A protein has these predicted regions:
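Residue-level signature of mid-helix packing/kink "hotspots" within the transmembrane helices
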Residues: 1-9, 91-92, 211-219, 303-304
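Conserved MFS/SLC helix-loop-helix module at the cytosolic interface between two early adjacent transmembrane helices
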Residues: 6-43
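Extracytoplasmic gate region of multi-pass secondary transporters
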Residues: 166-208, 214-217
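C-terminal transmembrane helical hairpin of 12-TM major facilitator-type secondary transporters
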Residues: 229-277
Length: 348
């Protein structure tokens, strides 16, 4: 998580040097190198691989929403939904397959190899798309030439100016708080279920259900926000849905399935909502890049504290009540940030 936050701030400089798609290609290469390094039976290589892996993911998290906004401005809702849905799906597949692959192969090389192959495939597909673009794709899908009306201000200068915009910090709260929720849930819900007598494999299944449920929800988030009377109403509904899911998790038994679906749908929609709010409150690609960098850089750094605070509360109180009260408070704070972001103002 620390790598996510710190490396996010490198995105504007990388984009200024390599261009938007070149920067995304470099991030994918880092992702592939990081996954490959984990095969080396050496602690330093493993740690370096994990850092490069986090750096690649962080850069892609910042850059891909900008690619969507600048290259497919008429399809932002659908493509942002698909993008965030795939993020959730990949996490769900990882949670579901890690233990079986390890048990089947008897080594961490099997799950590591699975994701190395995935990173290689992603890089190959991306490079193929870039090659198709150079061979005459439509102007809407092009990824190199800047638009005439694009911001003239340098990315780093715009980022510094964005730091002074109150709305940018509100959007950072929207991104950071939803990140806090998913990291905390993924880190501690399996431990809670294990304390209730659930097997390790079964906890993986429920985490998969939780993350997979976010896929259809994230795709439908743009339409959901349109049918709601206001963004603040949509934020309140998603917050309530997450709280109900959390209550079902704690109840256990027959409530686990509907609770996992409800919490997962809310979580997936929250991430999609964060990107949609960024897009709607920025005018150009450079403004989107600055807000995406700030919200994800600071947001991820703050989100890393979520699992730590949850664990400290568990240790200090000896029970699960205080940690889950903290979790509920984070949900409510997310809804408050969406309410504050319900404005016609833009950051840039």
């Amino acid at each position: 998580v620390a790598a996510f936050g710190l490396c996010s701030f490198l995105a504007p400089a990388l984009q200024a040097r390599l261009g938007l798609c070149g920067a995304a290609s470099a991030a994918l290469a880092l992702l592939l190198l990081g996954t490959a390094l984990r095969f080396i039976a050496n602690l330093a290589a493993f740690a370096g691989g994990m850092f490069l892996l986090g750096a690649g993911i962080a850069l892609l998290n910042v850059l891909m929403p900008v690619v969507i906004k600048t290259r497919w401005p008429r399809r932002i809702g659908m493509l942002m939904g698909l993008y965030t849905g795939m993020i959730g799906l990949s996490g769900a597949v990882g949670g579901l397959t890690a233990a079986p692959l390890f048990a089947w192969g008897g080594s961490l090389s099997w799950p590591f190899g699975f994701w190395t192959a995935g990173a290689l495939l992603a890089l190959m597909v991306w490079l193929l798309l870039m090659q198709c673009r150079t061979q005459g794709q439509s102007s809407e899908s092009r990824c190199s030439a800047p638009k005439p009306a694009e911001d003239k201000e340098r990315p780093l200068g715009l980022l510094r100016r964005t730091l002074r915009a109150p709305l940018a910090w509100i959007l950072t709260g929207v991104m950071g708080l939803q990140s806090t929720l998913i990291y905390t849930a993924a880190a501690w819900m399996p431990s809670y279920w294990r304390s209730q007598g659930m097997s390790f494999e079964t906890t993986g299944i429920w985490i998969f259900v939780f993350l997979f449920s976010g896929l259809p929800a994230s795709v439908m988030t743009a339409k959901f926000f349109k049918v709601c009377p206001s963004d603040r109403t949509a934020g309140a509904v998603l917050s309530l849905l997450y709280v109900l899911g959390l209550a079902g998790w704690l109840a256990g038994g027959a409530w686990l399935l509907p609770a996992s679906v409800a919490a997962g749908a809310a979580q997936g929609a929250m991430l999609s909502a964060a990107f949609l709010l960024m897009a709607s409150h920025t005018k150009g690609g450079q403004g989107m890049l600055a807000v995406s960098t700030l919200s994800q850089g600071i947001g991820y750094l703050a989100a890393g504290a979520g699992p730590f605070i949850f664990g400290r509360l568990l240790q200090a109180t000896g029970g699960w009540t205080a940690p889950f009260v903290f979790f509920t408070a984070v949900i409510m704070l997310w809804g408050l940030c969406v309410r504050l972001a319900d404005t016609h103002q833009t950051v840039d």
